[in-house]
Amino acid sequence: MEDLYPSRQNNQPKILKRKDPVIYTDRSKDNQAPITKEQLDSYEKNGFLQIKNFFSEDEVIDMQKAIFELQDSIKDVASDKVIREPESNDIRSIFHVHQDDNYFQDVANDKRILDIVRHLLGSDVYVHQSRINYKPGFKGKEFDWHSDFETWHVEDGMPRMRAISVSIALSDNYSFNGPLMLIPGSHNYFVSCVGETPDNNYKESLKKQKLGVPDEESLRELTRIGGGISVPTGKAGSVTLFESNTMHGSTSNITPYPRNNLFMVYNSVKNRLVEPFSGGEKRPEYIAVREKQPVYSAVN
């Protein structure tokens, strides 16, 4: 298969134009979408969309309870699915929750989310990756700028830009508690990064990403084109959907206010993983689902 988005192959970074649609369902069918035309326009232009108060207060309480019960149950468990902060033993992320936990399986199968995702991707979908992210007050560490698609393409073999990340806020998101930051319009440009991917790179990158991180000049250019940086803020229960190639990152959290979220990545069934474009070993199933792929269709 031709590599349309080569990265980590040269000693100089390069910005390539996107070769894929942003919204896969024809825009003539906007009236059939579960979101408004204005929301579709915003997603297509910016590469992300925040929907505030998506989940009710009761649903948020249930999800908050579930993420902390799971965290407490495995705090002393040694598991590759549990990622801990690089300078402590605090849990940073728990992966593969959509298949390992019945409650989060139900959340992944929420019709309200699936209707939007299926419309944007123009097909049935499956969960490529799921995780809970914990960013406690005073301790939560930063995560450098990156495009998820760059990693999924190079290390997992995701062929095209036909996936969407859904971040469910389970804490109030402020502009100061290590929030998600996104560069508007960056999904239209692929930053081909420098470096060579070693086997098992994920063991380090999930704690602190060093490869697949864009250079400063490319980031300056993306922010110039996009007109700056956006920070979705809002109450717990808000949902932010962002396109697989949207450049994003977050700062450390030095405030008393935690920022926790449930993160689901939906990939089109027409965009299933092939061999990693790095030529290296496949990442584990709990990071990049290949084998067990329950398909979320309009029928079920």
From Swiss-Prot:
2-oxoglutarate binds at residue 135. Keywords: Dioxygenase, Iron, Metal-binding, Oxidoreductase. Optimum temperature is 32 degrees Celsius. Active from 5 to 50 degrees Celsius. GO terms for molecular function: 2-oxoglutarate-dependent dioxygenase activity; iron ion binding. GO terms for biological process: ectoine catabolic process. Binds 1 Fe(2+) ion. It is an enzyme of class 1 (oxidoreductase). The keyword NAD does not apply. NCBIfam families: ectoine_ThpD (TIGR02408). Belongs to the PhyH family. EctD subfamily. Homodimer. This is Ectoine dioxygenase. It comes from Virgibacillus salexigens. The gene is ectD.
